[in-house]
From Swiss-Prot:
Protein keywords: Aminoacyl-tRNA synthetase, ATP-binding, Cytoplasm, Ligase, Magnesium, Metal-binding, Nucleotide-binding, Protein biosynthesis
Enzyme class at the top of the EC tree: ligase
Lineage: Bacteria, Pseudomonadati, Pseudomonadota, Gammaproteobacteria, Enterobacterales
InterPro entries: aa-tRNA-synth_II, aa-tRNA-synth_II/BPL/LPL, Phe-tRNA-synth_IIc_asu, Phe-tRNA_ligase_II_N, Phe_tRNA_ligase_alpha1_bac, Phenylalanyl-tRNA_Synthase, tRNA-bd_arm
Name of the molecule in the record: Phenylalanine--tRNA ligase alpha subunit
Originating gene: pheS
Length: 327
């Protein structure tokens, strides 16, 4: 008890000298721990007469409280200093030049699809989709493609079994739309299609977009005008366009569409035709009342022509040196 004031003074001095929270905690243990100097003072109470013990205990507790308050104050001071130091170290120098954020870009084929969808959207076409794993009815039979047609051969088509396959065209979307919707119909059907072929101008998977209009009094003139306007818009120039007679099982008459290239040669860009009456009958539409036209085009081919790409496979190799050109 006689050294109590000295212990408090010694504790406060040690507290003030503590340079961090860890050192401060060592001081706390030294003076207020289970075997601390001030804690042990309580054991001296047994040496005092019973009537003096309460007053002496109060004095010891007061000394411990002074030390605890000093500990709390110093801890707050040290923590505040540490926080200020950390904030100072993390301060952002706004005068430093910023780091440039690298912007991404759309894949060139995606850019082509978006551009075509935008054009036909302004003409009132809606986008329709369908399954990539198709049955032979929607991929072939309903489209007036007979069983002996070469497209059904194993070397041209990826078959799962006798009736299921990876679709070879998005025409099945047209069939499903006509099965579930009465005319007037005006859709485009973009999507992935699959054919067993791989070379400089063919890949096993590629993107196709087909269009379909079914309504009363639709003529080949409507088809020609629509596609002529589309091609001029897509290539952003007034093109020389020709419609060359062709054959597709699902259209009659049918045509291939060519544009005159800068080298003075005709370039094939898409196929089209008037919807075959048998196709309309297959989906329950009366060909005596309604007519329509359809067209189909490869997205990769149009992208190659628009941007001057010579190898179709470049679209699938993910070479950033190639893709960065289209940002």
């Amino acid at each position: 008890m006689s050294h109590l004031a000295e212990l408090v003074a010694s504790a406060k001095a040690a507290i003030n000298e503590a340079s961090d929270v860890a050192a401060l905690d060592n001081v706390r243990v030294e003076y207020l721990g289970k075997k601390g100097h001030l804690t042990l003072q309580m054991t001296t109470l047994r040496e005092l007469p019973p009537e003096e013990r309460p007053a002496a205990g109060a004095v010891i507790n007061e000394a411990k409280e002074q030390v605890q308050q000093a500990l709390n104050a110093r801890k707050a001071e040290l923590e505040g200093a540490a926080l200020n130091a950390r904030l100072a170290a993390e301060t952002i120098d706004v005068s430093l030049p910023g780091r440039r954020i690298e912007n991404g870009g759309l894949h060139p084929v995606t850019r082509t699809i978006d551009r075509i969808e935008s054009f036909f959207g302004e003409l009132g076409f809606t986008v329709a989709t369908g399954p990539e794993i198709e049955d032979d009815y929607h991929n072939f039979d309903a489209l007036n493609i007979p069983g002996h047609h070469p497209a059904r051969a194993d070397h041209d088509t990826f078959w799962f079994d006798a009736t299921r396959l990876l679709r070879t065209q998005t025409s099945g979307v047209q069939i499903r739309t006509m099965e579930n919707q009465q005319p007037p119909i005006r859709i485009i059907a973009p999507g992935r299609v699959y054919r067993n072929d791989y070379d400089q101008t063919h890949t096993p998977m590629f993107h196709q977009m087909e269009g379909l209009i079914v309504d009363k009094n639709i003529s080949f003139t409507n088809l020609k005008g629509t596609l002529h306007d589309f091609l001029n818009n897509f290539f952003e120039e007034d093109l020389q366009v020709r419609f060359r007679p062709s054959y597709f099982p699902f259209t009659e008459p049918s045509a291939e569409v060519d544009v005159m290239g800068k080298n003075g040669k005709w370039l094939e860009v898409l196929g089209c035709g008037m919807v075959h009456p048998n196709v309309l009958r297959n989906v329950g539409i009366d060909p005596e009342v309604y007519s329509g036209f359809a067209f189909g085009m490869g997205m990769e081919r149009l992208t190659m022509l628009r941007y001057g790409v010579t190898d179709l496979r470049a679209f699938f190799e993910n070479d950033l040196r190639f893709l960065k050109q289209f940002k």
